[in-house]
Design a protein with these regions (language model features):
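Sensory-domain boundary capping and coupling elements
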Residues: 1, 7-10
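Flexible nucleotide-interacting loop at or near the entrance of a catalytic core
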Residues: 14-73, 77
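Nucleotide-binding/hydrolysis machinery
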Residues: 55, 97-100, 175-185, 192-303, ...
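Conserved post-Walker A coupling segment in P-loop NTPases
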Residues: 62-129, 139-155, 220-225, 273
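Conserved helical "switch/dimer-interface" subregion of ABC/ABC-like ATPase nucleotide-binding domains
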Residues: 63, 122, 161, 165, ...
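AAA+/SF3 P-loop NTPase mechanochemical coupling elements
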Residues: 103, 133-143, 147, 155-161, ...
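Short gly/ser/thr-rich secondary-structure transition/capping motifs
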Residues: 125-132, 168-173, 196
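Bacterial C-terminal helix-turn-helix
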Residues: 306-319
Length: 319
C-alpha cells in the first residue's frame, strides 16, 4: 500500500493580514518621519541648505556667514524669486539671535494708514476701536531679527519714522507716552532701484545709508545657470514627498531646455515648473514632454523660444 499526503506550511489568513497591516503602518510612519525631517531642514534655513555650487553663490554665502555674527543692518537686493527671505532667515539662524524671534513684515502689502500701528503698536484708547493695547512687530522682534520685506514700497511718511528707530533703537507706540527701548537686528530687502528712487525723491537717502551698512546683491537665476541641476535635484526630492511620487531625476534634453531659458521668475518659477511636470509625469525621469511649451524652441526658428504670455504659467512673487 502507498500513502500519499500533503504537508501545508500556510499561515492562518488573519496572521497574514496582521503582517500586511504592520508593513503598511511602518511605511506610513517612514513617510511621516521623512516629511517631518524635510520640514525641519526647511525651517532651519542654514547656509548648508541654500542650494547651489556656483562661484557667485559661494561668494555671497561667505559674506552672509561673516555678517551673521554681527548685529549690523543688512540690505538684500535682488529680483523677485531670487531667495532674499531664505538668505535673511539663514543669517538669523546662524546668529547669536537664533533662539529669538524672526518677524517678517511685508511693507508692500500693509495699507499706509495701518503700517505705523503694525510696526510700532498702539496703546488702549489711542483711537476708536483700540479696546486694548497691541504690541508692534518691532517689540515682538525684541532680542531677535525683524525682516522688512520690500522696503522700497514703504511710504515716505513712514521712512522718517523708521529712520529714527534705526538711529535711537526705540519705538513710540501710537498713543504711548514714553518711548520703548528695543534690541532688534534689521534685515531689509528690495527688488527696486533705490538709487533711482532717491533721485526721484521717493526714497530717503539717509534711510538708505542706515539700511545699506551691509549690502548683499543676489543674482538672478539666469546669471547662475550652473546651479540649475542642483536646484532641480533638490526640488524633485522635496516634491516627491509632497506629491507622493518616486521620480529619480530629469532627462538631459529637459535639463538642457531649463538651462537655455532666461527665468524671469527666477527660482520660484523653476520650482513651479518642476512641480507642474511632476504632477503629470508617470515615469522615473522628467522628460521635455512634461515641460511647458514656452520653454521649447519653435519649429520655425529652433533658436527662438515661444514666450507667448498666454502659455506662461502664473507664479507668485516670492522672496
Amino acid at each position: 500500500d502507498e500513502f500519499v499526503g500533503v504537508i501545508s506550511t500556510a499561515r492562518p489568513i488573519n496572521e497574514l493580514k496582521e503582517l500586511i497591516g504592520k508593513l503598511n503602518k511602518s511605511q506610513e510612519e517612514l513617510n511621516y518621519y521623512k516629511e517631518e525631517f524635510f520640514k525641519q531642514i526647511s525651517n532651519n534655513s542654514s547656509f548648508n541648505n541654500i542650494i547651489g555650487s556656483s562661484r557667485t553663490l559661494k561668494d555671497i554665502l561667505y559674506i552672509c556667514e561673516k555678517t551673521s555674527k554681527t548685529t549690523s543692518t543688512i540690505l538684500i537686493r535682488g529680483e523677485s524669486g531670487t531667495g532674499k527671505e531664505l538668505i535673511a532667515k539663514a543669517v538669523h539662524n546662524n546668529s547669536t539671535r537664533h533662539d529669538k524671534p524672526f518677524v517678517r513684515v511685508n511693507c508692500a502689502s500693509i495699507p499706509e494708514n495701518l503700517l505705523e500701528s503694525e510696526l510700532f503698536g498702539y496703546e488702549k484708547g489711542s483711537f476708536t476701536g483700540a479696546t486694548k493695547s497691541k504690541p508692534g512687530k518691532f517689540l515682538i522682534a525684541d532680542g531677535g531679527t525683524i525682516f522688512l520685506d520690500e522696503i522700497g514700497d514703504m511710504p515716505m511718511s513712514m521712512q522718517v519714522k523708521l529712520l529714527r528707530v534705526l538711529q535711537e533703537m526705540e519705538i513710540d507706540p501710537i498713543g504711548g507716552i514714553d518711548p520703548i527701548s528695543i534690541d532688534v537686528r534689521v534685515i531689509a530687502t528690495t527688488n527696486r532701484n533705490l538709487e533711482e528712487m532717491i533721485k526721484e525723491k521717493t526714497f530717503r537717502q539717509d534711510l538708505y545709508y542706515r539700511l545699506d551698512v551691509i549690502g548683499i546683491n543676489l543674482p538672478a537665476l539666469r546669471e547662475r545657470k550652473e546651479d540649475i541641476p542642483d536646484l532641480v535635484e533638490y526640488f524633485i526630492k522635496k516634491l516627491n514627498i509632497k506629491l507622493n511620487k518616486n521620480i529619480l531625476g530629469i532627462s538631459n534634453d529637459a535639463l538642457n531646455l531649463l538651462q537655455q531659458y532666461q527665468w524671469p521668475g527666477n527660482i520660484r518659477e523653476l520650482e513651479n515648473i518642476i512641480e507642474r511636470a511632476m504632477n503629470f509625469c508617470d515615469e522615473k525621469y522628467i522628460s521635455s514632454f512634461y515641460l511647458p511649451s514656452y520653454l521649447k524652441p519653435t519649429i520655425e526658428n529652433p533658436n527662438k523660444f515661444d514666450l507667448d504670455k498666454d502659455n506662461i504659467l502664473p507664479f507668485e512673487e516670492y522672496e
